């Protein structure tokens, strides 16, 4: 060995080579990664037609990472639906999961007629401005996918890669009627077990989730109430149902002009038993507009929860293909 090689060996920290050495180093690596895998609660102040409101969001990953993934939930859900997906992608992205106004930790609007896509899209633009990035990747489930389509169709959009989870350019009237049957309810539950039974009932189309996943969804779907009635209530504004009552939809909603204006790479996901995204619409999404890649998940209705390994892997592969 030359003198130069000897000096390099002496002054350079050696990598662990034996199993015992690697075992000693690994806990330190795990500890260093832990902050990235812990959710951080944040909020942003937004402006609506009748005043200001706060939109809460959960953030994962390195806070200074310029690669940002925004994950937006369905109509009565919240950003904690994406915890499993966020953990899986926190090493590559700063993952941001908002609670759309009226849900989760976000404020409720005083004028219930303001609940709608103009406010939702404006709030997401404000959120992205707060994140201080020019571009984002987007995963949207159901309503979150519609918000994503609307934003991605605009000139100058910040969305450069789009995942549409069980939603497309045609929203069936039948599915909206089904959703309208429960969205305006304000059920109370005596205990978490009763709440979980309800979540399992209305969430039956989500597919075969584990007991732990159902408990997770329940934990973030209800909160303990301190009023006279007590018990547990859903963490969304029952006033969301007023939109359905005031504006009943007798026919399917056609968003093809919006979809065909999208220019970024797009992945469309569908639960094989979905009543919201019909097979013909799903197939056409692969041929029109951004010509989406299409993946269908068996044994699932509306909507895949992106909690199991296969669903997460599908989303991950598509998103990181653009890295």
Where are these regions (language model features)?
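Active-site loop/oxyanion-hole signature of alpha/beta-hydrolase fold enzymes
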Residues: 49-51, 84-87, 97-139
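Catalytic histidine-centered segment of alpha/beta-hydrolase-like enzymes
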Residues: 300-309
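Conserved hydrolase catalytic core segment
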Residues: 134-173
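Alpha/beta-hydrolase fold catalytic core
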Residues: 1-69, 91-93, 310, 316-323
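Conserved serine/cysteine hydrolase catalytic core
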Residues: 223-284
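Conserved alpha/beta-hydrolase catalytic His-Asp/Glu region
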Residues: 190-249
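Short beta-to-alpha linker loops that shape the active-site pocket of alpha/beta-hydrolase fold enzymes
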Residues: 99-104, 168, 298-301
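Conserved HGGG/HGGXW glycine-rich cap/lid loop of the alpha/beta-hydrolase fold
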Residues: 58-105
């Amino acid at each position: 060995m030359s003198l130069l090689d000897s000096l390099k060996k002496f002054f350079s920290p050696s990598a662990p080579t034996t199993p015992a050495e690697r075992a000693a180093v690994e806990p330190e690596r795990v500890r260093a990664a832990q902050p990235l895998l812990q959710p951080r609660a944040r909020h942003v102040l937004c402006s609506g037609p009748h005043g200001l409101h706060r939109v809460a969001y959960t953030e994962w990953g390195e806070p200074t990472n310029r690669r940002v993934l925004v994950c937006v939930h369905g109509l009565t859900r919240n950003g904690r639906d994406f915890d499993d997906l966020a953990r899986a992608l926190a090493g590559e992205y700063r993952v941001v999961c908002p609670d759309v106004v009226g849900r989760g930790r976000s404020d409720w609007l005083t004028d219930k007629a303001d609940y709608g896509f103009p406010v939702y899209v404006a709030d997401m633009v404000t959120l992205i401005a707060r994140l201080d990035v020019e571009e984002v990747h987007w995963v949207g489930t159901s309503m979150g996918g519609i918000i994503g389509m609307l934003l991605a169709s605009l000139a100058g959009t910040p969305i450069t890669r789009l995942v549409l989870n069980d939603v497309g350019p045609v929203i069936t009237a039948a599915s909206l009627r089904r959703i309208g049957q429960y969205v305006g309810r304000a059920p109370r539950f005596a205990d978490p077990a009763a709440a979980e039974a309800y979540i399992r009932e209305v969430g039956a189309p989500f597919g075969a989730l584990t007991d732990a996943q159902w408990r997770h969804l329940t934990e973030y779907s209800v909160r303990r109430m301190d009023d006279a009635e007590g018990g547990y209530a859903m963490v969304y504004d029952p006033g969301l149902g007023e939109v359905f009552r005031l504006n009943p939809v007798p026919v399917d909603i056609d968003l093809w002009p919006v979809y065909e204006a999208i220019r970024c790479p797009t992945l469309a996901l569908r639960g094989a038993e979905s009543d919201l995204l019909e097979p013909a619409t799903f197939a056409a999404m692969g041929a029109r507009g951004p010509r989406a890649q299409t993946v269908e998940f068996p044994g699932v209705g509306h909507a895949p929860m992106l909690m199991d390994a296969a669903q997460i892997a599908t989303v991950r592969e598509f998103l990181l293909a653009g890295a």
